[in-house]
Swiss-Prot record:
Principal subcellular localisation of the protein: plastid
Residue positions binding ATP: G47, D48, R49, G50, T51, G52, K53, S54
Protein name per the record: Magnesium-chelatase subunit ChlI
E.C. number: 6.6.1.1
Catalytic reaction annotation: protoporphyrin IX + Mg(2+) + ATP + H2O = Mg-protoporphyrin IX + ADP + phosphate + 3 H(+)
Organism of provenance: Chlorella vulgaris (Green alga)
UniProt pathway annotation: Porphyrin-containing compound metabolism; chlorophyll biosynthesis
A single Gene Ontology CC term: chloroplast stroma
GO MF: ATP binding; ATP hydrolysis activity; magnesium chelatase activity
Segments passing through the bilayer: none
């Protein structure tokens, strides 16, 4: 099936509404905060099979607003921001050419488990480059993911080198392909969302540390909630469009709340005393490097903006700090306490909540 047909089918297929998802609050919060501030650095979602990981990610993308892009550009170039433009678009603007502008939904790109590095990064047609003297570049998935979300299911089963490539691009916002002395770069600023089942193996600590957040989800045990989830799904499958209509108002409200939070974010204040306490917690937990401190500061500001406030409270920090630090702790086989609970315990002591 060609790409155009696939895309139209994807757009025609109704998506389960984000606000209809029952439970899994930790995962939903981590995703929303990454959309408010993509510099948080993505999220790794670990949990049992069938707990709605991919459903929730797709639902979030459906919730997000449309963005302006250059119409005939495969990199989703932003017509106003040079940092998010391909070299070709930048060149056209420098030559004072008019570029066609259109709007489109923020895209979510799925990374297949068996994808090669060429499929992910793109390829250079060396023969064409040598014979015609042009940089013939075939964009990969990273180009398609620019200004969107890159979703990797079962990321713990992906080749380590490929995970490294994804994390490098997510951190720098650029993808560079080099072949036979020819180098091509393009913007690749995306939110990286990985998911996996811990029974199938963990990511190496060096890779795990580079995800901004780590959400843990489990199968819902409460019988009443399970019944509610099953009924929701059955109602959606029976009449998806009517089901989506039921949640139209709550979807619009959440979408607006996220947009307002993004606009408010630059004004958020995090007290010096709180920043010191965050760093003290990281130090006491023996967290390597400063990523934990940085991400916790960013996430605390993002949640305050989501709540419509301009100042971060200790409660904001308490809600996000397990997400930001649990995957950065050194594993002790003799310790039975959950890593998230360990972070909360240290937080309570440092902030005087005991």
């Amino acid at each position: 099936m060609n790409t155009v047909v696939e895309n139209s089918l994807e757009q025609a297929r109704p998506v389960f509404p984000f606000t209809a998802i029952v439970g899994q609050e930790e995962m939903k919060l981590a995703l929303i905060l990454n959309v408010i501030d993509p510099k948080i650095g993505g999220v790794m979602i670990m949990g049992d099979r069938g707990t709605g990981k991919s459903t929730t990610v797709r639902a979030l993308v459906d919730l997000l607003p449309e963005i302006q892009v250059v119409a005939d550009d495969p990199f989703n170039s932003d017509p106003k921001d040079p940092e998010l433009m391909s070299q070709e678009v930048r060149g056209r603007l420098q030559r004072k050419e008019t570029v066609p502008i259109t709007t489109k939904k923020i895209s979510m790109v799925d990374l297949p488990l068996g994808a090669t590095e060429d499929r992910v990064c793109g390829t250079i047609d060396i023969e064409k480059a040598l014979t015609e003297g042009v940089k013939a570049f075939e964009p990969g998935l990273l180009a398609k993911a620019n200004r969107g979300i890159l979703y990797v299911d079962e990321v713990n089963l992906l080749d380590d080198h490929l995970v490294d490539v994804l994390l490098d691009s997510a951190a720098s916002g650029w993808n560079t392909v080099e072949r036979e002395g020819i180098s091509i770069s393009h913007p690749a600023r995306f939110i990286l969302v990985g998911s996996g089942n811990p029974e199938e193996g963990e990511l190496r600590p060096q890779l795990l540390d580079r995800f901004g957040m780590h959400a843990q989800i489990g199968t819902v045990k409460e019988p009443n909630l399970r019944v509610q989830i099953v009924e929701q799904r059955a109602n959606f499958d029976a009449a998806p469009l009517e089901f989506r209509e039921t949640y139209q108002d709550s979807q619009a409200q959440l979408g607006n709340q996220i947009l307002e939070a993004r606009n408010l974010l630059p004004q958020i204040q995090l007290e010096y005393d709180y920043r010191v306490k965050i760093s003290q917690i990281c130090s006491e937990l023996d967290v390597d490097g400063l990523r934990g401190d940085l991400v916790t500061n960013r996430a605390s500001k993002a949640i305050a903006s989501f709540e419509g406030r301009t100042e971060v409270t200790p409660e904001d920090i308490f809600r996000v700090i397990p997400l930001c630090l649990r995957h950065r702790l050194r594993k002790d086989p003799l310790e039975s306490i959950d890593s998230g609970d360990k972070v909360r315990d240290i937080f309570k002591r440092v902030f005087g909540y005991e």
